[in-house]
Amino acid sequence: MQHYDIIRMIGKGGMGEVYLAYDPICSRKVALKRIREDLSDNELLKKRFLREAKIAADLVHPGVVPVFTICSDSDLVYYTMPYIEGYTLKSLLKSVWQCDSLPKDLAEQTSVGTFLSIFHKICSTIEYVHSRGILHRDLKPDNILLGLFSEVVILDWGAALSKEMKEDVLLDLDIPMPGSMFSNMTVPGKIVGTPDYMAPERLRGAPASESTDIYALGVILYQMLTLSFPYRNKKGKKIHVPNHIISPEEVAPHREIPSFLSQVVMRALATDPKERYTSVQALKADIEQHLQGSPQWTPKIALHTQDAECWKFHESILLSKYFPMLEVSPALWYSLAISKIESFSEVRLEYTLLRKGLEGGFGILLPPSENVDHGDFYRGYGFWLHIKKNVLSVSLVRNGLEIQKTSGNIDVNQEKFFIAFEKQNHRLSLNIDHTVWMIHMDYLPGRGGRIGVIIQDITDVCGNIVVLESSGALHVSCLAVPDAFLNEKLYDRAITFYRRIVESFPGRKEGYEAQFRIGIAVLEKAAEEGDQEGFSQALREFSVLHDSVAAPLEYLGKALVYQRLEEYNEEVKSLLLALKRYGQRPEISRVRDHVVDRLHEALYSNHRVSLVFMLLALHVAPESINSSEEEHFLKNLQGKIHDTLFCSLDISPIDFRSSKMELLLSYWSGFTPFLPGLFQRSWDLKDYRALADIFYTAADLGEREFIDVYGNTLRENIQATTFTEDIVEIFPHQLIHFLSALDAIFLHAPVEKIFSDVDILDPVLIIYLFDLFAKDVLIHGKGEQILDAIQVLETYVSPQQRHTYLLPYEILAYLWMKEGKKVHELLSAHYDESFWIEDSHWAFVLYGYWLALTEESSLAYLHLSGCREDHVAPRALIGLFCSPLGICENQWSYQERRNLLLQKFIFFHCLGDDVERDNCRVAYDLLVKERLL
């Protein structure tokens, strides 16, 4: 264990202890589990402990914590794993047991719907584990970790066993340790596992099997649905086999448990193993069926691909013209066919495609009925499927933009694929070979009408495209008639009919939905006519829903209005109000889905608000972001990560689903409502480095109130806490001095006052303070003070830190003082000339400023405009400003716009253009004050 710095203990079990540790070689925090010292001499227990580690190391699945290292060579036997922030399912269940009323956030966390999503992930993990020939044998809520970002992880593989092995009696006996303080913890000969979660046959001494794991899953699902046990075996009493278990819907009628789910639980808990599910896969399939709300479908029409009578028109198109975001060759021609018939309000399309057709790409669309033959076929929703190198990708497209994408490996020998596309209620889904690949929710009145097909060779569709109607669609919604008027842009007639529905269904779902659609109709009319009063009327229509059962729709509607008006602060504020106030209302899911939809929309249009919606999505719908999207997002964020001080000072890589990523997004977007939550989370974890990062971010964004309130809270917490654990990073008392220095910066105190405690501060804190101080004095025309600060600080940081973090500001100070000779000396002495033309390097910008100060302005413009126009580093945005194409304001985040104004301020100062320089200062102060998203 000498390779790790132990931070604190985070868990203790019968055989092992788990510590939070720091791995200095890989620069990351890990969870280190070691065998207890009082058990370390027992070879049998060592063998069992190592068996647990090796089983976990052999399993590769998101639901199993991977093992980094296993150490069995020394007296201290241990292994390491990733450290995941979260809590156990047991702690969540325990927090609500026997509670008469629950807070909103806890009620949401323990709702039937939320628990089913978690249980589905548990089943997926155990299905994989069983496929590897492993039995867990001790499934229970204690051994299920719920991560802060929707991770669901199975823990504790100490009882796990390969199905091919016979149960090792010696390994599975619990050995009492005479003389140990834990000598009474076990009884020799006890069956491995937890009695409350053991199948009846297991309690009678039968060997473990997949069926006994399924029984344990049944007990867990029973607890999730009812918030109670199906039975309890009391400690000290003889273990009994339950004869009868009361159905979940009878035990907890207030939970409104569907009969189908009760049947699922009772089947999993069947006393006779033969009556249980035959596999976890079968159990998971029933859960999926319920989650998807699978309807009964009836075939209605068959579209013959070779029959011209089935199609309104059939022609060739250049696909890249209409779908520029798809990975298709701009020169490839595709066949487009649009059906004569219009699809039903709830429809399922079934067809079989040859592999060759998918290798070229295949699209299925629901274009609007109007103007479909005038080039508007790409409007509305559709799916695009494409095979490349045995990877099948599925993209959801809307109005020509790819808004969601997923992919997966396929069998290299598979030649045919069965595809099913469903549109039901507000849900669009795509199934491939009876497996769900993508689901998307859309709660706005649909514009789809006909069915469109895009493919290179229509003969690659095997047989017909079968159109099926849902049994639920036989009941026509009262909203269908006004929806039809809305689709035809007959706004006034649609509004009239919607109002009649509101009057006819007061206090009912239909009435609230009609009121919401009145707002949509008014909004669409205002947008089409450019009527500002119309937008105000739409806001008033949505306000009618205030404090009703459908209250989330008020704020969703208002967010749509503000989005059209490009008032993004108000848009995000509306969505936040809905999420905070009405987290338990049924309609809140529509707000969450809209957040995810806006994220994809903003990303693909390269809009600055994408950072805010990424942050919101991480909070309210993290499960909606898949691994390929994570990779794409991280790739796009690399420039910002590189230019973020708290990232560059921490060499460990940043995970997408982490508190640090939330802070990064808050920093660049200027969106700070989640800072209090990050503060509390970091304090609970005693992560003092993260607390320093948070206060640096708040100070940089000018959040004086946050620093005052939470700075005082931090001071009180530190003074009231006794610190016993080993601290490997920033010390708590240093944070108190850091906060005092932040206050001094806000008050524009002298250099000596700000850095009066520099001798007791960690270098990271010193660099944070210097960065904040330097930017503040630069924009306020006091750049020379940077040199005074460097003189005070340079002995307290390493030479490398001085070069990386102090030197650029030193050069900026001399630029402010217009000492061109000194600037050139520093550039020549510290930066290789190759860096002067590398636009990702500080020297590129500094050299451009020097040219502006000492040479013709045209040379400065020419040099700076040589930056790359794609993926430009935030520190070099001045280069885009100098380029002929200029800056697109909508693309840049709050922090990028702020950086650009500071860069322009220095640039114009070097050019001697004091008027433009002062205009930049005014604009900078206004931006900081208003902080528009």
From Swiss-Prot:
SMART domains found in the cross-reference section: S_TKc
Any one GO molecular function term: ATP binding
Origin: domain of life: Bacteria
EC category: transferase
PTM text: Autophosphorylated on serine and threonine residues.
Keyword hit for Transferase: yes
Domain Protein kinase: from-to ranges: 4-291
Pfam annotation, one family: Pkinase
Database matches in CDD domains: STKc_PknB_like
Annotated active site: 138 (proton acceptor)
InterPro entries: Kinase-like_dom_sf, Prot_kinase_dom, Protein_kinase_ATP_BS, Ser/Thr_kinase_AS, Ser/Thr_kinase_PknD, TPR-like_helical_dom_sf
UniProt-listed Enzyme Commission number(s): 2.7.11.1
Residue numbers binding ATP: 10-18, 33
Catalysed conversion reaction: L-seryl-[protein] + ATP = O-phospho-L-seryl-[protein] + ADP + H(+); L-threonyl-[protein] + ATP = O-phospho-L-threonyl-[protein] + ADP + H(+)
UniProt keyword annotations, A-Z: ATP-binding, Kinase, Nucleotide-binding, Phosphoprotein, Serine/threonine-protein kinase, Transferase
Sequence similarity: Belongs to the protein kinase superfamily. Ser/Thr protein kinase family.
Function: Together with the serine/threonine kinase Pkn1, may play a role in the specific interactions with host proteins during intracellular growth.
Protein name as annotated: Serine/threonine-protein kinase PknD
Gene: pknD
